[in-house]
C-alpha cells in the first residue's frame, strides 16, 4: 500500500471523506488504479457519495485484477465488496447472487476458514431477510453464528446475534429477538464497539423489543 493510499484511508476512518477522496485522486483514478487498497477505498468513497456506478466500477476492476493475478483471497474480497454495492442500492437479488458466487470460491479455497464463512453466511442470511425468505435467512444466520463462535472475533459474533435478532423480530418471536439482541450488545461491548451497541439499541426500538 502506498503512503498516499495509507493516508487517504486514515482520513476516511476519521470521517474526512472529502479529504480522503482529494488525496487519493491526486495520484490515482478508478479507471486505471491497479492497487487493491486503492480500489477498495474508491468503492467506499463512492458509496458514501451514492455514486453507485463508480463504486461498481471500482469493485468490478478489483475482481478483474484478482482473477488476472489468480489471487483467490482478493477475489473473494472483491466479490463481497461488489455485493455490498448492490446491497447499498437495494438490489438484494443481485447482491445475493454475488455472495453465493463468493461462497463457491470459499468452498474451493477456504473451506476451513470459519471467519470467512461466518461473514458470508451473515450476508446470505441478511439478504434473504430483505427478500422475505425468513426460513432460509434463519438457517444461514444460525450458521453464521456457529462459525463466528468457533473464532475469537467478537464483531462477527455480535453481527450474527444482531442478524438473528432482526430475523426473530421480523417473525414476531419477540422473546428470542430480545435474547439475541442483548447477546449482540454484550459482544459489541466486549469489543469496545460503541457504534455497534447503539445500532442494536436502535433496532430494538424500531422493532419495539424493549
PLM ranges: what are they?
Residues 21, 25-29, 63-67, 100-110, ...:
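Amphipathic alpha-helical segments of tetratricopeptide repeats
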Residues 33, 73, 113-115, 155, ...:
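Residue signature of alpha-solenoid helical repeat architecture, marking inter-repeat boundaries
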Residues 6, 41, 74, 81, ...:
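"A position-specific structural signal for the A-helix of alpha-solenoid helical repeats
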Residues 2-29, 45-48:
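Alpha-helical segment of the N-proximal tetratricopeptide repeat
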Residues 2, 37, 77, 117-119, ...:
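Residue register of alpha-helical TPR repeats
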Amino acid at each position: 500500500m502506498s503512503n498516499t493510499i495509507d493516508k487517504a484511508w486514515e482520513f476516511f476512518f476519521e470521517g474526512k471523506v472529502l479529504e480522503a477522496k482529494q488525496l487519493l485522486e491526486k495520484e490515482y483514478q478508478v479507471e486505471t488504479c491497479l492497487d487493491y487498497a486503492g480500489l477498495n477505498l474508491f468503492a467506499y468513497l463512492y458509496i458514501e457519495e451514492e455514486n453507485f456506478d463508480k463504486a461498481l466500477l471500482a469493485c468490478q476492476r478489483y475482481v478483474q485484477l484478482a482473477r488476472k493475478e489468480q489471487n483467490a483471497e482478493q477475489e473473494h474480497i472483491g466479490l463481497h465488496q461488489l455485493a455490498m454495492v448492490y446491497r447499498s442500492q437495494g438490489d438484494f437479488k443481485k447482491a445475493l447472487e454475488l455472495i453465493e458466487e463468493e461462497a463457491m470460491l470459499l468452498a474451493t479455497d477456504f473451506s476451513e476458514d470459519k471467519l470467512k464463512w461466518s461473514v458470508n453466511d451473515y450476508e446470505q442470511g441478511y439478504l434473504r431477510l430483505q427478500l422475505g425468505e425468513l426460513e432460509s435467512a434463519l438457517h444461514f444466520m444460525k450458521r453464521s453464528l456457529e462459525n463466528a463462535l468457533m473464532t475469537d472475533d467478537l464483531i462477527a459474533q455480535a453481527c450474527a446475534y444482531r442478524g438473528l435478532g432482526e430475523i426473530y423480530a421480523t417473525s414476531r418471536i419477540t422473546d428470542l429477538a430480545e435474547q439475541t439482541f442483548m447477546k449482540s450488545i454484550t459482544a459489541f461491548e466486549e469489543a469496545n464497539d460503541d457504534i455497534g451497541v447503539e445500532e442494536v439499541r436502535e433496532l430494538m426500538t424500531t422493532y419495539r423489543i424493549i
